[in-house]
């Protein structure tokens, strides 16, 4: 198992790096050049930089990921592609994407886009909380223990 993180706006990178490093599982953070950092990562953690274009990180993750790898993303499109490839896919708020829930998530995203396109407003996501982080930590630890 390898872990790939759609890292541009991921609020749980610290949890992923800490837990994966303890378990000696390699982590690849995929992020745009606009988030470049000189920060040194622990052994087993690699950062890949991609162009800032739409979905560049998603495409790179899909090139790298193999069946049974673990991907952390908040992007439903990437989650759908990764599930089709046989990957385990987690959202940073602590839930697992599945073949049973991805269609509803994509449909909701589409309907919200149509509402916005018509000039109306939609609610954004709720703020990320400490409870969300702990929920993610518990799920992540259970997934890497498999």
UniProtKB/Swiss-Prot annotation:
Q: Which InterPro entries match?
A: UPF0178
Record-stated family: Belongs to the UPF0178 family.
- State the protein's name: UPF0178 protein BCE_3095
């Amino acid at each position: 198992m390898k872990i790939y993180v759609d890292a541009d706006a991921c609020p749980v990178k610290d949890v992923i790096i800490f837990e994966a490093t303890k378990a000696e599982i390699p982590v690849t953070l995929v992020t745009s050049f606009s988030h470049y950092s000189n920060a040194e990562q622990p052994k087993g953690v690699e950062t890949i930089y991609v162009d800032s274009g739409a979905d560049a990180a998603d495409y790179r993750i899909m090139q790298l990921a193999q069946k049974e790898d673990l991907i952390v993303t908040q992007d439903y499109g990437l989650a759908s592609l990764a599930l089709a490839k046989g990957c385990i896919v987690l959202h940073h708020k602590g839930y697992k994407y599945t073949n049973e829930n991805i269609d509803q998530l994509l449909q909701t995203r589409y309907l919200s886009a149509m509402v916005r396109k018509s000039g109306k407003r939609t609610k954004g996501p709720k703020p990320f909380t400490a409870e969300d982080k702990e929920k993610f930590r518990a799920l992540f630890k259970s997934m890497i223990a498999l």
